[in-house]
């Protein structure tokens, strides 16, 4: 499936129906009064978050979404039919902005969460509304009001508890395929992963945790270099970052610092997110020339985060690393619950 994480669309709510001018014409009411009904309300445009969508691909092919107009008023004080609301389904994790002002309109993170994004126009008034002691036969009515019209920018931020980050070719796709049933494209060259891959990793309890393999970041990603700028936003919703570092690199410390600097430059508290570090590809390291334990100690001193020696290919060290992930997630969940009840 092609991954589309941004889209620009136009939405327009329905116009309110027009009020009408009408008079009672019953046989035994020779001086019938006004009976023109009001117009119906225009339909609204409502966004609904659903679980079975993972991309904004549908919005690439359809850019304009319009709800139905309200019906005209009728005689005998009948109000026109309301226009049908237009329901637009979006993936959970969709953030909606006004494309012209940049204002945040909504953030749909939960299944079935709804947001009225454009309200339908109010129906116009029929002439019966204008009946008064001074005017017993008003011959005018009001048209319905237009519905709201907006130009929107949609952004999809993945809903994953654990974000796997690192430079290109750190082994992120291999790791997520080893941990879960996900089968991302894997090859030995940079930027193999062009879209974020999701995998569900099972805890010993059987509960699933969503991991996201974030495409490789490079120096300058926060300023738009490489693939990073478009994908850094996906890290925003994660609770824990699993920072993967290639143990076969010529300079492991430099690689670590490169990613940390990009997280700090991007802001939004990403550099303060709880992290676990993993030196990957230890099966390919010459232990006689590389002291992995010393590198792990250096990284621990730099990051103040736990460091694990792993191989995603041979699955060496994955279980202890996962136990640390589960423990940190439990801490984060406990802190969030404490904040809710405090």
Swiss-Prot record:
Annotated binding of GTP, by residue: 166-173, 191-195, 213-216, 280-283, 311-313
Keywords from the UniProt entry: Cytoplasm, GTP-binding, Hydrolase, Magnesium, Metal-binding, Nucleotide-binding
Ranges where the Obg domain occurs: 1-159
InterPro entries on file: G_OBG, GTP-bd, GTP-bd_Obg/CgtA, GTP1-OBG_CS, GTP1_OBG_dom, GTP1_OBG_dom_sf, OBG_GTPase, P-loop_NTPase
Residues of the OBG-type G domain: 160-330
Pfam families associated with the record: GTP1_OBG, MMR_HSR1
Localisation: Cytoplasm
GO cellular component: cytoplasm
Required co-factors: Mg(2+)
Enzyme type, top EC level: hydrolase
Residues involved in Mg(2+) binding: 173, 193
Molecular function terms from GO: GTP binding; GTPase activity; magnesium ion binding
Gene Ontology biological process: ribosome biogenesis
EC number: 3.6.5.-
Top-level taxon: Bacteria
Gene3D superfamilies reported for this sequence: GTP1/OBG domain, P-loop containing nucleotide triphosphate hydrolases
Primary role: An essential GTPase which binds GTP, GDP and possibly (p)ppGpp with moderate affinity, with high nucleotide exchange rates and a fairly low GTP hydrolysis rate. Plays a role in control of the cell cycle, stress response, ribosome biogenesis and in those bacteria that undergo differentiation, in morphogenesis control.
Record note on quaternary structure: Monomer.
Record-stated family: Belongs to the TRAFAC class OBG-HflX-like GTPase superfamily. OBG GTPase family.
Protein name according to UniProt: GTPase Obg
Gene: obg
